[in-house]
């Protein structure tokens, strides 16, 4: 009898695993299918052949080693911002402030890169990367503390901090940190010792891509093999139960927000030290918000994040060249990305709205009681 029960339980476990796999697969395939159908309709409307254009995009994104390098280079910042988003969403914290942490982390790393002496040699690069991650962690630690201690809505606080980050970095790059030897809106160049090496010269793919993969590996190990990772997942599933079994919910919230800022700031640092070499207005074209879409497309899983980042990187790298070889404008890529982001917004609403409703209900109960 016990063997039969064990077999049934094993079968149920396998069934649940297959079900979760199918759900993730559908969650990846459906937004992509709809996005490309919308893009195909737009192409037909302007008299283009969708099959030919999509084949051209695939060729431009993955046709040879140089094009693959360009795609991976475009995907690199998204590896960081998607992990920074996923680590919070997995814990039930709706952090939309990754863009701000990316900006301040990037500026912090670049600041050290041109102010510390070049004589530090090989020590300069890790110092800059670490400082960028630290500033990013502090940046998002603050709204995490406000949420944990005073229940300040994290969606509002982190969204507003994006504007604060843009304002602060914009002021500094146009004022105290403005380069004396360049035009407006740029800092001085970092020392050569602070730059991340190129992986496939003359392409722009740099070692930040490898750092991004290490960040995803660290995220996966943290989720599956650390007590704090299990506690964060439990908080995301059911805060009341987490409290009942002794998990510090406020402490977990502060931790995941700080870790999110760490990854986002590290991403900004890698982008600055490997791609830009200086900070300027327009340092980020919205990597934080695109990372949100990547994380949701990948269902917060490490492999899903890699897939989503490479997909968006392919769209970005191919989009800049297809308009040179066809009559298709760059807006086609925006259509595909925008449709995926609509699905991401729907997913955020599906998760966040009930959670916010439960939070307000608890607040009303507390006020009434």
Residue ranges, per PLM feature:
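Membrane-interfacial amphipathic/re-entrant helices at transmembrane-helix boundaries
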Residues: 2-80, 122-123, 127
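Helix-loop-helix "hairpin" substructures at the membrane interface of multi-pass membrane proteins
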Residues: 118, 138, 200-278, 302-307
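Short loop segments and helix-boundary regions at transmembrane helix junctions
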Residues: 15-26, 46, 89-97, 119-184, ...
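Single transmembrane alpha-helix segments in multi-pass membrane proteins
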Residues: 41-48, 56, 61-116, 129, ...
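Transmembrane alpha-helical segments in multi-pass inner-membrane proteins
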Residues: 258-264, 268-338
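Cytosolic-side transmembrane-helix boundaries in multi-pass membrane proteins
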Residues: 1-34, 40-44, 237, 244-251, ...
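Hydrophobic core segments of alpha-helical transmembrane domains in multi-pass membrane transport
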Residues: 28-44, 81-85, 106, 110-112, ...
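Transmembrane helix-bundle core of multi-pass membrane transporters
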Residues: 154-225, 278, 332, 362-363, ...
């Amino acid at each position: 009898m016990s063997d039969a029960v064990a077999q049934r339980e094993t079968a149920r476990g396998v069934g649940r695993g297959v079900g979760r796999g199918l759900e993730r697969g559908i969650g990846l395939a459906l937004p992509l299918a709809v996005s490309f159908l919308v893009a195909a309709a737009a192409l037909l409307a302007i008299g283009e052949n969708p099959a030919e254009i999509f084949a051209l995009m695939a060729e431009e994104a993955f046709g040879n080693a140089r094009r693959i390098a360009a795609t991976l280079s475009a995907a690199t910042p998204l590896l960081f911002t998607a992990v920074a988003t996923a680590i919070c969403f997995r814990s039930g914290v709706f952090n939309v402030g990754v863009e701000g942490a990316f900006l301040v982390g990037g500026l912090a790393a670049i600041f050290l890169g041109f102010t510390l002496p070049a004589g530090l040699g090989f020590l300069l690069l890790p110092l800059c990367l670490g400082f960028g991650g630290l500033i990013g962690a502090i940046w998002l630690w603050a709204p995490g503390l406000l949420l944990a201690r005073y229940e300040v809505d994290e969606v509002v606080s982190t969204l507003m901090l994006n504007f604060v980050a843009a304002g602060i970095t914009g002021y500094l790059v146009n004022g105290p940190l403005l380069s004396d030897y360049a035009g407006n809106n740029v800092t001085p160049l970092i020392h050569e010792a602070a730059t991340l090496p190129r992986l496939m010269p003359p392409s722009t793919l740099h070692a930040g891509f490898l750092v991004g993969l290490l960040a995803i590996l660290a995220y996966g190990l943290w989720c599956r093999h650390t007590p704090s990772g299990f506690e964060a997942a439990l908080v995301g599933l059911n805060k009341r139960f987490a409290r009942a079994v002794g998990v510090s919910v406020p402490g977990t919230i502060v931790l995941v927000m700080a870790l999110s800022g760490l990854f986002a700031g590290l991403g900004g640092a890698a982008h600055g030290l490997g791609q830009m070499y200086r900070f300027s207005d327009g340092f980020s074209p919205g990597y934080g918000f695109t990372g949100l879409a990547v994380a949701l497309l990948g269902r917060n899983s490490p492999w899903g994040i890699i897939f989503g980042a490479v997909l968006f990187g392919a769209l970005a790298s191919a989009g800049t060249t297809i308009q040179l070889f066809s009559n298709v404008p760059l807006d086609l890529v925006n259509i595909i990305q925008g449709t995926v982001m609509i699905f991401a917004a729907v997913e955020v609403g599906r998760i966040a709205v009930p959670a916010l409703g439960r939070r307000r209900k608890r607040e009303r109960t507390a006020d009434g009681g």
